[in-house]
């Protein structure tokens, strides 16, 4: 035995020898240090976490093993239970509690954060905390929880942080060392399974690099054969452009990337399966499987198909027969039996977990996945395929970063199974091999803190430690640590700007030169002109809104903008004066609601008599009515469309005065004015940049503490906190807020304390709770205005009250210079209401598209949002001051947790 007796015992039980980085990290841990381990996916970081479990059990103390996802917690609980036995290992994931008093408990990070704020007795005897996937602290929504835990754990707890490879590991380790004491940073960039990079051009596979050429310099060169082939391919395309083509014929020489079945067949022939193909859209993943099913592609033997069917039946046996067709079960099953599957967050969890089990077992050979698979789920492959090097980030298509490329291709190569892993990029004419080489060669994935105070965090810190200690804690965050370091670069930027300003000023005749005065005056005129144009646009929009609200049934109007331009008749007046959207039928037979974006606000050009009921969805009715509209308008004088000037009749005395000063300025008629003005404008631009940098320096210094004080100010104003700023006290309402963990925590607390959600039936409560958790996918976070399609009047009233509370809260936030909370979103209200009432999945999913948006709700999203509603309902059940509301929340939970929502709750 050596001095590291426990490490010797631990390794003696392992079926493999420790790698060097694992040995170093475990040795540091036994010597009493905390550790930060940064290593590639699949390198074996979790061995270090498991050694912390071993040390805790050997010492008779406790270890908490935290993960960011419930699925990961379930997986780790299964692994540890198999090794140490059911009595030694517990599981806490918010909606699941198994043996919570065990010496080793696996949990989501949020559960541990909540324990810390509640001073839970379970923290007694805690010696180790393993934080798996600690790089999640960069996540905008959930990342702050990791820092809250690291900062607030008792000093004698050793933290084991396990992270993917990040380029600023030393900075991250330096921060942990500062706040946690002795911490050993272990960085290992060596992949246990070498990764080979390839490019698939048509049906030919090329190595991306020629490693023989670059070995001497240590940096491989792009494969010349690949470059030559692509050059020939592009030349063939150019020649094809010049070829005459018969009508209707294609372009025989034009390059088309291989189809998905062809790619999978090629990988199969090359012995490169199993493979994960990353497709950056859910619909694309499903379409890929459908394309493969339409081809002769089959990747499984008869024996494998029997095993696959057994797993499917075991995993999905609890699903109701009536739901199977709605879920696309039969096509999904057929894909699995042929060794093919999609994997994305829109899938039912039971389906997704079945795919993971079958792929890990080597039974499913080709998976088409979104990038979410690269985060956390243990599902390595022999090969990773990238169809594109750009992805949609919710707003626009952006190129993959080197960090994203590394994370995605990191799935290639299964330790202990594959000798090497493979990354394949599908070539398109817009892709340059050098671009792929740059992504593959760069290891830039810096960890950036997302830490920021929330209302719940603020109230808990005030309650536990008071404002002064809270300031000190916030000043120790990784966010502040990075901000303080960034100030150095900002100050250098200011100094560089000042030097350039001095040089330009010397050229122009000093910092008070007449040309600079003239340039400032010209900039002011431009600013005032822009402000006047904005005011004019707002005035026109308001005029259009007022005119829309005044329209009555039968009015004939002219739609002035957009594709629907021309005559229209009003079928139904607007319901909402604040956002009027009357229903109209155009002369081109289109029926729908228009907004101020379609209408300039001109008065109706006439009117016509309409039938009592107009079935505008029927083509025949639309045709006849459009004909009647044209006849009614035949004798009317239709005013010609005219362009409204930007100024819109506004008169701004300051603008007129500034223009006059500009014309009279001595420099105005100087020779060579434009050359001088260019330099002067450059001076003003650098001056503005410097002012912005100075504001950033001021904001970076103690920025979190100042934000915290603004939160305290707002909470004091709303009576969640009482007393002077130096000695605040949390009120009863504040204690209510302290128990709400939600992005909309303060709004929920306001709804509970004001009684906005009282008197509701269970399905109605589920509906209004969904409005504060749901966020429309790909939208602006707001659903349609609460209208007549809300299921019940009482629910509509509760939604309206919630919306009003949100509006006043957002106004207060703006007054306190706090980023406004997002508004309620009613996009899931009808869905959850119908599910709660009926348990009918088809009816619930159909309710998602009641407004005809054409964007169906996927089953996986449905389950995910149901579970978020369940989580908040559970908090309402525990925190609401009204006993009747607590009971209603409990019944609502029972109504939601059934069918597909209850199946496979991991």
UniProtKB/Swiss-Prot annotation:
<dbReference type="InterPro" id="IPR014001">
    <property type="entry name" value="Helicase_ATP-bd"/>
</dbReference>
<dbReference type="GO" id="GO:0003724">
    <property type="term" value="F:RNA helicase activity"/>
</dbReference>
<keyword id="KW-0067">ATP-binding</keyword>
<keyword id="KW-0547">Nucleotide-binding</keyword>
<dbReference type="InterPro" id="IPR050699">
    <property type="entry name" value="RNA-DNA_Helicase"/>
</dbReference>
<dbReference type="GO" id="GO:0005886">
    <property type="term" value="C:plasma membrane"/>
</dbReference>
<dbReference type="GO" id="GO:0055087">
    <property type="term" value="C:Ski complex"/>
</dbReference>
<dbReference type="GO" id="GO:0016787">
    <property type="term" value="F:hydrolase activity"/>
</dbReference>
<dbReference type="InterPro" id="IPR011545">
    <property type="entry name" value="DEAD/DEAH_box_helicase_dom"/>
</dbReference>
<feature type="binding site">
    <location>
        <begin position="39"/>
        <end position="46"/>
    </location>
    <ligand>
        <name>ATP</name>
    </ligand>
</feature>
<dbReference type="InterPro" id="IPR001650">
    <property type="entry name" value="Helicase_C-like"/>
</dbReference>
<keyword id="KW-0347">Helicase</keyword>
<protein>
    <recommendedName>
        <fullName>Probable helicase HelY</fullName>
        <ecNumber>3.6.4.-</ecNumber>
    </recommendedName>
</protein>
<dbReference type="Pfam" id="PF00270">
    <property type="entry name" value="DEAD"/>
</dbReference>
<dbReference type="Pfam" id="PF00271">
    <property type="entry name" value="Helicase_C"/>
</dbReference>
<dbReference type="InterPro" id="IPR027417">
    <property type="entry name" value="P-loop_NTPase"/>
</dbReference>
<feature type="short sequence motif" description="DEVH box">
    <location>
        <begin position="132"/>
        <end position="135"/>
    </location>
</feature>
<dbReference type="GO" id="GO:0005829">
    <property type="term" value="C:cytosol"/>
</dbReference>
<dbReference type="GO" id="GO:0003676">
    <property type="term" value="F:nucleic acid binding"/>
</dbReference>
<keyword id="KW-0378">Hydrolase</keyword>
<comment type="similarity">
    <text>Belongs to the helicase family. SKI2 subfamily.</text>
</comment>
<dbReference type="GO" id="GO:0070478">
    <property type="term" value="P:nuclear-transcribed mRNA catabolic process, 3'-5' exonucleolytic nonsense-mediated decay"/>
</dbReference>
<feature type="domain" description="Helicase ATP-binding">
    <location>
        <begin position="26"/>
        <end position="184"/>
    </location>
</feature>
<feature type="domain" description="Helicase C-terminal">
    <location>
        <begin position="259"/>
        <end position="463"/>
    </location>
</feature>
<dbReference type="Pfam" id="PF08148">
    <property type="entry name" value="DSHCT"/>
</dbReference>
<dbReference type="GO" id="GO:0009274">
    <property type="term" value="C:peptidoglycan-based cell wall"/>
</dbReference>
<dbReference type="GO" id="GO:0005524">
    <property type="term" value="F:ATP binding"/>
</dbReference>
<dbReference type="InterPro" id="IPR012961">
    <property type="entry name" value="Ski2/MTR4_C"/>
</dbReference>
